[in-house]
Amino acid sequence: MKKYILSLDQGTTSSRAILFNKKGEIVHSAQKEFTQHFPKPGWVEHNAQEIWGSILAVIATCLSEADVKPEQIAGIGITNQRETTVVWDKTTSKPIYNAIVWQSRQTAEICDELKEKGYSEMVREKTGLLIDAYFSGTKVKWILDNVEGAREKAENGDLLFGTIDSWLVWKLSGGKAHVTDYSNASRTLMFNIHDLQWDDELLEMLTVPKSMLPEVRPSSEIYGETIDYHFFGQNVPIAGVAGDQQAALFGQACFGEGMAKNTYGTGCFMLMNTGEKAVASEHGLLTTIAWGIDGKVNYALEGSIFVAGSAIQWLRDGMRMFKDASESEVYASRVESTDGVYVVPAFVGLGTPYWDSEVRGAMFGVTRGTTKEHFIRATLESLAYQTKDVLCAMEADSGIELKTLRVDGGAVKNNFLMKFQSDILDVPVERPVINETTALGAAYLAGLAVGYWKNQDEIKSQWHMDKRFEPTMEAETSEELYAGWKKAIEATKAFK
């Protein structure tokens, strides 16, 4: 009987189930979108029950369409939108409020108060993160402070907190396992990434009772089994968990110190494996846990770019410059340069290394001769410049010089962008055959735990390159272009 690993990829807008075979190839997949709730400007919420329903639906669809029986599943891996926060009743398993999504800014005031009280340095030291509404801790506090009776129930031990991975493991196991993995715990603002424990001082700062928190476990081990009625009568091991960006780093087989990947989605997330040491950042990066496996924990430096693929969508939908995102490459290639035009797509502020949420988008160097092609090319180039900003910060913090950059996500199909990325970084850019690296990473973590794959060396041998982009631009030219970008950033920051 052929066996497979089932990966559950729970994202910000949809849930997916993907079946992988022994070679790490996709056998079949199913996807289902769910509702985004915007109760107030800047707030983003999901219905956690609807997310659970979407997961059950994609599991059923994927298995039936692939004609795979539940007993053929060797293990389940879970990867998830990180930081998104669910608080539910321990007895009924019902959420007491919507899931507060990572993008949601509804806890910005709580963050300002904590900063004013002087907690920033302590938080930075213990968690590797900044005090920001992005992370889970302030979201839990908000729910306890704003939902009637919640704080009392929490203090009585009747409520549980989890990021989406915890919520799904809880539901799949029928409430038997309340766990999370190191990678997800490291995004909560409540976990000490050095001693690998929930931190009493951080919990006190956020007034979150410890009894609510899940047990933190390695990213690759059997956490529990599915209960019969959720999985067509089968008890399948739930065996791998990692946050989406860390799962992508694992799926790209970036196991060595100094290896890095960049995911070009709505935004960009770049992670560099720093091995078994947590490198503190002096340049606006986050220090995070990549994964815990075989009794060891790997750390990573992470940079976030807020606008990447969404800039291409903006050209298509907002500016109506083309009908299909793939056309952006055709237009950009029609001109030899942007003719001095720079686009800074700071639609929601700037991420790493600037962390400026007040600044807005801008365009520079426009003349009467500027065409649509120049504008499209400049927008695409901005993704590469922002990635270079992050890489410069990573190299400065880690003291490691990048040898190659592995890439994944929607925008990597754009050959113009990948070639320009390689030129501006002056390192080769490698695009893998399997672009679904997030789901693949979760599958690998689960497969290792159940013995489906032997070790990381076997996984490394399965990573195959689709295309390698080599830098050919003169150093002088790329330095000049990047200097122009830095000037554009400074000018953008001045205009608020």
Curated annotation (Swiss-Prot):
Q: Which cysteines are joined by disulfide bonds?
A: none
Q: Which InterPro entries match?
A: ATPase_NBD, Carb_kinase_FGGY, Carb_kinase_FGGY_CS, FGGY_C, FGGY_N, Glycerol_kin
GO cellular component entries: cytosol
**Pathway this chain belongs to:** Polyol metabolism; glycerol degradation via glycerol kinase pathway; sn-glycerol 3-phosphate from glycerol: step 1/1
Q: Where does sn-glycerol 3-phosphate bind?
A: 12, 82-83, 134, 244
Pfam families given in the database record = FGGY_C (PF02782), FGGY_N (PF00370)
Q: Where does ATP bind?
A: 12-14, 266, 309, 313, 410
Report which superkingdom the organism of origin falls in: Bacteria
Q: Where does ADP bind?
A: 12, 16, 266, 309, 410, 414
Q: Which residues cross the membrane?
A: none
Q: Which UniProt keywords apply?
A: ATP-binding, Glycerol metabolism, Kinase, Nucleotide-binding, Phosphoprotein, Transferase
Indicate yes or no for the key word Transferase.
yes
Q: Which reaction does it catalyse?
A: glycerol + ATP = sn-glycerol 3-phosphate + ADP + H(+)
> Which CDD domains does this chain map to?
FGGY_EcGK_like
Q: What molecular function terms (GO) are annotated for this protein?
A: ATP binding; glycerol kinase activity
Q: Which positions are annotated as binding glycerol? A: 82-83, 134, 244-245
Describe its function: Key enzyme in the regulation of glycerol uptake and metabolism. Catalyzes the phosphorylation of glycerol to yield sn-glycerol 3-phosphate.
Which family, according to the similarity comment?
Belongs to the FGGY kinase family.
List the protein's name.
Answer: Glycerol kinase
> Which organism is the protein's source?
Bacillus cereus (strain G9842)
Starting at the broadest rank, the lineage of the source organism is: Bacteria, Bacillati, Bacillota, Bacilli, Bacillales
Q: Which gene encodes it?
A: glpK
